[in-house]
Amino acid sequence: MPLIESDATGSPTDQLQRLPFPPVTYSHILHCSYDYWQPKYRALTPKSRIIPLTSSFVSYLHADGIVLPPENTPPTNDDDDFSDDPDAEEEADPSKDWPEVHAQIKSAIAELDGKVTPKLNWSAPKDATWMAATNDLQCRTPNDIYLLLKSSDFITHDLEHPFDDCVPDTSYSPAPISTPPEVKYNLVLRKYVNFNPSLEFRCFVRNRILLCICQRDQNHFDFLFELRDTLRSRIQSFFDEKLKDSFPDSSFVFDVYIPAPHQRVWLIDINPWAERTDPLLFSWLEILRMKDPIGIQEEDDSAEEQFVRLSLNGHSNGDQKPESESESEEEVEKAEDDAPLLPEFRLVKRDDPEAYSFTTPQYSAHKLPKEVVDASMTGPGGMSEFLGQWQDILSRQGQESDTESDN
């Protein structure tokens, strides 16, 4: 959600418009990079390959236009007829500048049964699936991957703005570097699995407490309501056992997939605790103001504190409060009574106006007119020609407007 600029800095209105996030550090963004966290949780993630990218390949992703390597098609007799033409233009092959990366991508596709889904360090090119023949992230060839990466605004953000609104991390050095660290970019190829989108969930963690959960797909699925308690229990146990004490940052957002029969939880992604991460069915202001769930409290055996927590069923193990219990403890218990017992698990309800968006195109703001895409794929000259034609059209429209105003 974008922040709204205000001229009255420091005013109450301005303060409300600024979400109360803690500073987002460079290290937090790096910890959410796939190549950092996936090796720590390899057994919890779907099968994948991580390919380090060379500077020449990163430059290719930065470059304007979409120029793909030639497909490896066998020559035909018609091709032989023109092979001796000295004026024939050789088809551009950008992969000549990064042959190692190209070869590793081919090899990884073969190792992962011929179908993969790509992403960079943080983002997958989900906004570019309209460019794919399958209308999803499924890729069978290197060119399928290059086309998605080159067409995606999400990938461009990974490349150009990974540390927007971040601050240096002072916990690692008394004199932190003021400039953002250099990013070692990687291409992640995950074995293609036809995920059931209704069983993907986003989970929000604040100060190592699982705060709330929601479904990722914003359509209504009636069967999820019967499974809500089971799924919440699975996610809570997964977090407590696998992520709570092992991830370096205390606040983060993680995505999971829990396929039928809903016994195993797969870790799909880890995202920053930052405004750039989509809160989906929540708002960030709502999340930041949430009280921590108190969970199932156990009896305290400490002789010093001499009081007993309430158990899950709400019955105290003692009829009277110990005399040593202080007023502050009463206030704490009163605050806990107001707090939720379990993390909120939000699902799309049947009567939600957004519940039936099957025909609504995702990421439509990132799409381009077909003419622009076609021009970019003809090579560097194609886009220049298209821009020239576009300027001519605008010029003619301006002349026609001037003529009409004179009349």
UniProtKB/Swiss-Prot annotation:
The keyword tRNA-binding does not apply. Residues 68-99, 312-346, 374-407 are annotated as: Disordered. Coiled coil: none annotated. One of its GO terms (cellular component) is cytoplasm. ATP binds at K119, W122, A124, K126, R190, K191, E200, R202, R216, D255, D269, N271. InterPro entries: CDC123. GO terms for biological process: eukaryotic translation initiation factor 2 complex assembly. Residues 77-92, 325-339 have a biased composition (Acidic residues). GO terms for molecular function: ATP binding; magnesium ion binding; protein folding chaperone. It is found in: Cytoplasm. ATP-dependent protein-folding chaperone for the eIF2 complex. Binds to the gamma subunit of the eIF2 complex which allows the subunit to assemble with the alpha and beta subunits. This is Translation initiation factor eIF2 assembly protein. It comes from Emericella nidulans (strain FGSC A4 / ATCC 38163 / CBS 112.46 / NRRL 194 / M139) (Aspergillus nidulans). The gene is cdc123.
